[in-house]
Amino acid sequence: MERIRDDTMKKKLIGLALSAAMLFSVLSVPAFAAVPEESADPALTTEQTAAEEENCFFTSSSTEEEKEPNSITYVALGDSICAGIGLTTVQYAHNLMGVDVSFNFKGYPETCYVGQVGKSLNLDRDHAINLGLPGVMSKDMLELVKTGTMAEMNTLSGCQYNYPEFVDYIKSADIISIQLGSNDAFVPTVVSFGEATNWKSEDLASIVLSGNLRGSSKETEDALNESLKKLSLTRSEKDAVWNLFFSGMNKICENAYPESSSNLRQIVATVKELNPDAQILIIGATNPVPLLPSWSNYFSKLNNYEKQLADVYGATYVSIPFAQTELDGHPTVSGHKYIADKIVKAIEAQQ
């Protein structure tokens, strides 16, 4: 009975997280729009559907001459951004989200930034490992890099990962990237959103989970509009949502920063201790909702802290201010390519 309750809670939290991402999209703009336009990469401004974008990637890839695989090993630690969630080619079972995504460690989509870094460095799937975990918060990753297991379920995100091989992956890597911190603010916001609306999100969550939102079909658009109509809120629920977005988030972000910065420091220190010879890259964050001052302030402080952290531990900070994101808050294929290019440049600069 306890197992059933846990599974139900996980599904509710994961579904709500995706639903809340849609609500945030009302306030979202492409991440690179918040910075000077002349600095933006023109390649990222081309409008394409997700399928067209990924098809272009695979078409261009097939014409290149094959090279001998490199012998170095790249390991990426991160959350759903790292995992490639949102890409049309990502493979995962919804009932295993937050529980077991080990199939994505080597079976990740070629278009995610881990896949594109691997391609640029001529790494096969045994030498480019994607340890991106959807829903993971910095405190969860700290447990995983130390012991390979989460002692208990994260009741906010609904995830509980257990991978004893985590430590071995870190020890065997030549290059390790760390991309974390977004969920420390996002997950508590999601839970607060659910409480404010009395969890009226089932239909919307179903559409988001289908993966069709990155397409452009009228059928998906109509279904989305219908689900939004069903998300009818009472006056008190509307007031609660309003208070969340315009005051509650300030407190959430203020509380998130001390924890995320402390956990990130311990994660980097632990990784450094496990593998002192590895090149460590700390990947900055892109704010998917720059119109919310509380989030902009959180990500600004987090990025500044990560720069300092990199200096202290002899790591490399990789800034990604122009990473294009979709309505679900995750990078597009172009966004992943941009992140990958920045990572590859950082790696090559140290060689």
What are these regions (language model features)?
Residues 19-26:
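Bacterial N-terminal signal peptides
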Residues 34, 85-89, 141-143, 187-192:
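Short, solvent-exposed loop/turn and secondary-structure capping segments
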Residues 134-160, 331:
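Charged, often glycine-rich, active-site loop that binds/positions anionic groups
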